[in-house]
């Protein structure tokens, strides 16, 4: 393993958007800088060190602790202030919402901030560098036979298909998209909407209510 300059923690076992970002981004970054992950639930082919090693790296120089969650920001503070590790603290935020008081306090302790959109940056209350999410075109690209793919999904070639991908929860505004479809689709018979994403237990009632609205409209 090359010299470690950046440690990117992932302190959540369950797959989430943050975890997916780490999994996709680290291999790209590892071709340019000395970066490793730490924490559970990550693929074995990622450059990785145990948490105990992240907490005992030598103090010979500064390294970057790149957090994406509150728990990871908090651990970075512990490593630097209590264990006296030489970490510069970096936080990347994709959230487009008001942060809690605790999160705002954690953000104030960071040395630098990244936001994945101008909208996310507007909620940070501190200057942030905006770096938009990229797309790996070797993985995500149009199908070779789009008509066959549409048929597999039950869509006709002339259908106008709108896709929404990601966890189904109120915070993401999925309900606004459904409400717009309920108003517009009756007069646009070729329009189709597909939602694809995980529904966690705490959002099941929200998803069920959306399904009831769709069923009631006969769509």
Question: Residue locations for each model-derived region?
Answer:
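N-terminal subdomain of nucleotide-sugar transferases
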Residues: 1-44, 55-60
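Short donor-sugar binding/catalytic loops of nucleotide-sugar-dependent glycosyltransferases
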Residues: 10-13, 165-169, 199-202
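A conserved, positively charged/aromatic
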Residues: 86-111
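A short, active-site helix/loop in glycosyltransferases that binds the activated sugar's phosphate group
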Residues: 108-142
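A short helix/loop element that forms part of the nucleotide-sugar donor recognition site in Leloir-type
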Residues: 142-155, 210
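Conserved donor-binding/catalytic core segment of Leloir-type glycosyltransferases
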Residues: 151, 155-172, 178-183, 194
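Nucleotide-activated donor-binding/catalytic signature segment of Leloir-type glycosyltransferases, i.e.
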Residues: 207-219
């Amino acid at each position: 393993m090359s010299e470690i300059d950046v440690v990117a923690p992932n302190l959540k076992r369950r797959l989430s958007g943050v975890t997916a970002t780490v999994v996709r981004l680290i291999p790209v970054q590892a071709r340019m800088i000395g970066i490793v992950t730490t924490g559970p639930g990550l693929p074995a082919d990622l450059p990785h060190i145990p948490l105990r090693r992240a907490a005992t790296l030598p103090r010979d120089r500064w390294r970057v602790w790149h957090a994406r969650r509150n728990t990871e920001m908090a651990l970075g503070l512990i490593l630097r202030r209590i264990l006296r590790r030489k970490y510069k603290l970096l936080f990347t935020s994709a959230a487009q919402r008001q942060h809690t008081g605790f999160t705002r306090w954690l953000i104030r302790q960071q040395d630098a901030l990244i936001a994945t959109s101008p909208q996310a940056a507007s909620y940070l209350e501190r200057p942030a560098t905006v770096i938009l999410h990229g797309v790996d075109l070797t993985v995500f690209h149009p199908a070779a036979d789009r008509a066959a793919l549409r048929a597999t999904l039950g869509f006709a070639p002339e259908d106008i298909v709108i896709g929404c991908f990601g966890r189904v929860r109120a915070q993401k505004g999925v309900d606004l998209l459904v409400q717009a479809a309920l108003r517009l689709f009756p007069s646009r018979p070729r329009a189709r909407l597909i939602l694809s994403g995980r529904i966690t237990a705490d959002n099941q009632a929200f998803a069920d209510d959306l399904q009831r609205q769709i069923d009631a409209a006969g769509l």
